[in-house]
Amino acid sequence: MSDHAALHYCPDLLNFSRRITREVRVGNIGIGGNNPIRVQSMITSDTRDTPACVAEVLALADAGCEIVRITAQTKIYAANLENIAREVRSAGCTVPLVADIHFKPDAAMEAAKWVEKVRVNPGNYVDKKKFEIREYSDSQYEAELERIREQFVPLVHLCKDLGRAMRIGTNHGSLSDRIMNRYGDTPLGMCESALEFARIARDHDYHNFVFSMKASNPKVMIEAYRLLVARLDAEGSDWNYPIHLGVTEAGDGEDGRIKSAIGIGSLLADGIGDTIRVSLTEDAIHEIPVAKALVSSCRVSRQAVQAASRSLSDDAANIQIGWDKVNKDDATFLPHWKIDSGTYAVSFRQADSLPTVVLNRYREARDLILEKIEILTKLDSSRSQLDDLSSLREELNHLETSIIEPALNQGYGSCLFNNNQNAELVANALKHFDGTRYDLLAWCIMPNHVHVILKLAKGEELDKILHSWKSFTSHEINKLNGTSGSIWQKESYDHLIRDGKDFRNQIDYVLNNPTKAGFSNWQWTGCAYPELLARRQNHGLPRDAAATFTPSYNPFSYERRHSKPLSIQGHELGGEKTVRVFTTQSNWNALAHKISQMGDFKPEVIYEKSGAIEIDPRDASAISALNDRTEPTMITVADHVEMEPIHAFRMLAFQANPIHPILLKDTLQPPSEESDFLTSLLTAAKNIGSLLCDGIGDAVLIRGETAPGQSLRIAYNILQAAGTRIFKTDYVACPSCGRTLFNLQSTTQKIRAATGHLKGVRIAIMGCIVNGPGEMADADFGYVGGAPGKINLYVGKTAVKFNIPEDEAVSRLIDLIKEHDQWIDAPTISVSAD
């Protein structure tokens, strides 16, 4: 494990829980806090061309882009932002504009006058990158920081005075020599670079900023963002700044979309990220549907957004019952006190959950109290009458806790919810209308009864909601188990929560009910409050899994899981062996006529014949039986497990003996009909790519995309993008902006056409020197704009050919590859998997 092993970037590695952040205002919209994930992009037009810039901004806004960035190379370019902003506003468009600044503090000062947000790059705002190797003493290092303060503080004051936002955006490829020499070309260096600027901003009481940690390598990007969030959390609760996500230089086509989904999707799945930009080497407008689909595929729901900013203290303080507005209803079994949008504690139980003797004792005591309540309700309303009614209501509460609860906890009756599938049906029913008809604040499903705390939406009625829960679950549980008859008792108990103290007591009662009943690590509880969520237990493991349980991977440094190799259908996998591509029998049959001609790009193992053991990772007995095996066995998560695949496979990896290789699936709910290709692509890349980047996975199976050829192509492209298995040329291509010195899209296509057969060769295509050569990472060769119409060629990060005319540059790149003995002629016949 690294030096960061004690840090935690996520409160729950097995469930989605959105990171709590403050809101940062950017013009008329908010980022973070209680806001949805914002989608943004960047125009590619020359910033001096006002009509072109305005047209591109308006087109992006019409496509659903919520924030638009524009480059400002110099103060002259930045000054034209005034004209662009004026024309955009004159067109009735209110989308916030952001100036992208590198190298020029004076350009930032000018831009802040006209746009709602300024992006600064800590690596080059003041520092310069000359790839110099030198040692900095502490005093020299502090002197450099003072130089940064002198240049950066004026911008901080201006943004504060004008109400502008800021992004402190580190790029892996543009770390300064100062940072590189002290921290290396590492995620730690990226974090320190940004934190230096943040500390300066905070010293001047400026907090309206967000962070980003972009890299072209998804592994580096994921590690950097995780480390940043962990460092922010370690700094203190007031370092809760929003996060801007992006994989820079992702490229185009499927490759660009897959790289973006692996990086951005992995972090969104862990609740990290408040705004995203998908950087494609295509027209900017094509980024928007990808970003929207990516957010949608990560299921960042409205209630999840609300839960991220939900505070137990705030909700408790807001419960103040106006007793004159309480409607006191007589009901068949209990009096129900109702108030619009009230907060209730509700309990309901299985039909056979209580012995007759207990029910009779309860009903006798209850009926005596009801007689007194009936007499009081016939009197004219008064404060004393309400006090008396409250006292009687407390007596009813006492009957629940003194008679009913102890009997329930004895486990009488069929205890249907000891069965995970039955309990899961109830949990899904409770969550179904969360955020629409009610807010689900806390819940607990015990073996034979259920506790819920919820706040009703305006106009909703508790009895109708309770009926829908009981009706749906009765039908589904009977259907699942092949049974019939009543599942629930007609009686239920509800308590109108009257104030903050009562609310806290009820929350505590529900969440601690399993412990009081003698259960440890009971999985069927939930809570809307992150501060409690981090301390609860779920799925049989602590929610803060890293606190008492060592994951099978280091989230801040890649290391492959140490499984043992085995052979399946003639292919070795596991250990350090190649990650294999599985396919279904039906897809194999569809491709069988050309498999022999596919070379490296082909299906390898038939899933149905692989002998892989399917496991529900929540099933302790199944895990125990697996771990009793002494020989490596292929394992995977069973279909229809109601967990997100990332969480389910993590849970499997956490618990299974590491000798067993793991087969990753993109979905646990295989589609029954043709699916949307973009959604399938992004979901597969997020689910499988995230796990591969954490070293989990020895084989992959794609089923979300039903077309045989396309599913196969997705599998291989994910392996390539995750750096797990290289089968073709790899490209690092920036998305273009107003700085770009040549046509990136057409040039990228030309280079692909000429070099796409060079398996294992990595080529960087950079529009200018802002990120390249730094962002070329471990590229073998680089094609970088040096001046208008002129190209510089690189070997690694070293420029070797300068000022080559653009029309000669691709052929000169090929010559350079040949000089370094990495060229082979393209095959004359190429068979596609489609």
Task: Tell me what each language-model feature is.
Residues 37-43, 66-70, 95-101, 118-120, ...:
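Hydrophobic faces of well-ordered beta-strands that scaffold small-molecule active sites
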Residues 34-52, 71-73, 96-104, 178-191, ...:
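Active-site mouth loops of central-metabolism enzymes
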Residues 2-41, 156, 160-162, 547-591, ...:
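N-terminal amphipathic alpha-helix/helix-capping segment at the start of soluble metabolic enzymes
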Residues 72-114, 589-590:
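N-terminal active-site wall of soluble small-molecule enzyme domains
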Residues 94-132, 141-158, 163:
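Hydrophobic or amphipathic alpha-helical targeting/insertion segments
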Residues 136-152, 157, 178-302, 549-557, ...:
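Catalytic alpha/beta core domains of metabolic enzymes, predominantly
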